[in-house]
A protein has these predicted regions:
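Conserved alpha/beta core of the MobA/IspD/sugar-nucleotide pyrophosphorylase nucleotidyltransferase superfamily
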Residues: 1-18
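HAD-like aspartate-dependent phosphatase fold
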Residues: 18-138
Length: 138
């Protein structure tokens, strides 16, 4: 199972092919919804273009998708049904986040000297995701 990675630059080029995406659910993959006012969690339709784009990335095997949401864990069943109904492919999901700013903190060092995290903000309920991430699948 030994793989010769070649030079350090070869290694950098190899690992740059792989990404982990933390993707908010409501307003990004499905139309925005809430717990207390309609439309309620699990009831909204998907944002087709964003779903299709992420599914294509997921199918490459080089993009790991973690869905993030402020939905409570108590909404897990209806959320998972909605994800299945809309055909959303993902690897993991995180519930119970604050409905507030989210920041990713990551390290970098000699084995990965390039920036190791980015942030993308899109307008709620739009199909802009591919425009911001278009180079990921290449």
């Amino acid at each position: 199972n030994y793989i010769d990675w070649g030079t350090k630059e070869d290694w950098f080029n190899y690992v740059r092919q792989y990404k982990t995406l933390f993707v908010d659910l409501d307003g990004t993959l499905v139309k925005s919804s809430g717990k207390y006012t309609p439309p309620y969690w699990g009831e909204t339709e998907g944002i087709k273009e964003n779903i299709e784009f992420l599914n294509r990335l997921h199918e490459t095997g080089k993009v790991y998708i973690i869905i993030t949401t402020a939905r409570h864990k108590s909404a897990e069943e209806k959320t998972l049904k909605q994800l299945k109904r809309e055909g959303i492919k993902y690897d993991d999901i995180i519930f119970n986040l604050f409905h507030a700013n989210r920041t990713i903190i990551n390290d970098y060092g000699s084995s990965n000297p390039y920036p190791t995290c980015d942030a993308v903000n899109i307008v709620r309920n739009t199909n802009e995701l591919e425009r911001f991430l278009k180079d990921l699948g290449k």
